[in-house]
Amino acid sequence: MDISDFDFTLPEKLIAQHPPEVRGSSRLLVALPDMPLQDRVFGDLPDYVEAGDVLVFNNTKVMKARLFGQKDSGGRIEALIERVLDSHTALAHIRSSKSPKPGMGLVFEGGIRAVMVGREGELFCLRFEGGETVYELLEQNGHLPLPPYIERAADADDDSRYQTVYAKYQGAVAAPTAGLHFTEELLRRLKDKGAVTAEVTLHVGAGTFQPVRVDKIEEHKMHSEWFEVPSETAAAVEAAKARGNKVWAVGTTSMRALESAARATGRLKAGQGDTDIFITPGYRFNVVDRLVTNFHLPKSTLLMLVSAFSGMGHIRAAYRHAVEREYRFFSYGDAMVLGRNEGVVR
């Protein structure tokens, strides 16, 4: 398929630069199969969830992964931690006039010292000195890495608003943004209705913002991210399927974790590992029936994913409606509910 199949015109004014004033007050476009598009608010989500349905949330936590400093040689350097390997070692993207060489010392804000010990592809392996762990150093001295389309520096409000209320495990450099709409009160309402909540972990990498640079999407190479599906979640999903209930993925990262864990057999299995799953039209979904997601960038892999899930024509119509009604787009924007379109030609 051609990348141009996933292009659309988006007015710049619709790119949300800040979160809504109140968490959970975003708009919700309900775009389920076989029903007209509905303009709702996010607090109406329980109206579409049945007792016994399972909602799967990604409990990753965004690291303050951006560090500023200088090389021992004096040149400025910026590091974006992509993955923590152990308590004192991490892989990072480096921005500098000249790339550091193995053995070169680096000094970041707060007096953090590190040595560049090697490379893995485009990533630099940094070994941090001192008694504190990488996570502790980042929490004390790092900066939250907002997406590139948010044209401002992160502030104190982002420290809380760019995290979900259920975030647990540090490791992401971008938020699972569909989850940003959920409040503790909404989670209680869903449980009161009889919905089951379950969790996965997928540490969202910086690659989620990388553009597709090929004309034919089949030639695109997906980035790899670490994920885990606990046994409790696999059991909850299997039980829901047996009851005839629906499985909801809260966000594309939850969907990618679930579908990755079902890749081998077609049934969800507990486990962990790296995934580079690339979901495009023609993919056969094994687990997810409903998806809560934000609005995605033109020509992005996530737009391809939702097109695979609900059908390209359906997504085009929904996005055209969203632009006309001036929904807010991307990480701090509004949300939509999608259903698996069984009529999609696969």
Curated annotation (Swiss-Prot):
A single GO molecular function term of this UniProt record: S-adenosylmethionine:tRNA ribosyltransferase-isomerase activity
InterPro entries: QueA, QueA_dom1, QueA_dom2, QueA_sf
Protein's UniProt keywords contain Hydrolase: no
Cytoplasm listed as a keyword: yes
This protein's UniProt keywords: Cytoplasm, Queuosine biosynthesis, S-adenosyl-L-methionine, Transferase
Domain of life: Bacteria
A single Gene Ontology CC term: cytoplasm
GO BP annotations, alphabetical order: queuosine biosynthetic process; tRNA wobble guanine modification
Reactions this protein catalyses: 7-aminomethyl-7-carbaguanosine(34) in tRNA + S-adenosyl-L-methionine = epoxyqueuosine(34) in tRNA + adenine + L-methionine + 2 H(+)
Entry's localization field: Cytoplasm
Top EC class for this record: transferase
Gene3D superfamilies according to UniProt: QueA-like
Summary of the function given for this chain in its UniProt record: Transfers and isomerizes the ribose moiety from AdoMet to the 7-aminomethyl group of 7-deazaguanine (preQ1-tRNA) to give epoxyqueuosine (oQ-tRNA).
Subunit (UniProt): Monomer.
Homology family: Belongs to the QueA family.
Record-given protein name: S-adenosylmethionine:tRNA ribosyltransferase-isomerase
Organism: Neisseria meningitidis serogroup C (strain 053442)
